């Protein structure tokens, strides 16, 4: 058998190595998160950033309607066609930007409105909300 001093030294070496490995992994994870935050900041335009914040704030309440999105951006006095174009451009920009940062992830959960089947309601998917929350 080994003397007690050698066993204690081996134990201390294992603990120190484990701690160093743990801190290296934490550091690498934080660098990856920081890079994703930077990418998000660079790729999203001002309207897409506001739209993403709006979707994140309303995530727990459920789906947001097209009317709510238009009212949030102050476009409610525009013609219905320009409102539709604005929403389409906003959603397309958000989908493209987040699709580049999180490849393979579905960004929005889009459903028909219960009251008016012609209108759509929007919500971040659960996986996207969690990914953004962890940044």
Regions found by a protein language model. Name each.
Residues 2-15, 21-29, 40, 55-58, ...:
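DNA-binding patch around the recognition helix
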Residues 32:
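Short acidic (Asp/Glu) and glycine-rich catalytic loops that position anionic groups and cofactors
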Residues 75-86:
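Short, positively charged loop/turn segments that connect secondary-structure elements
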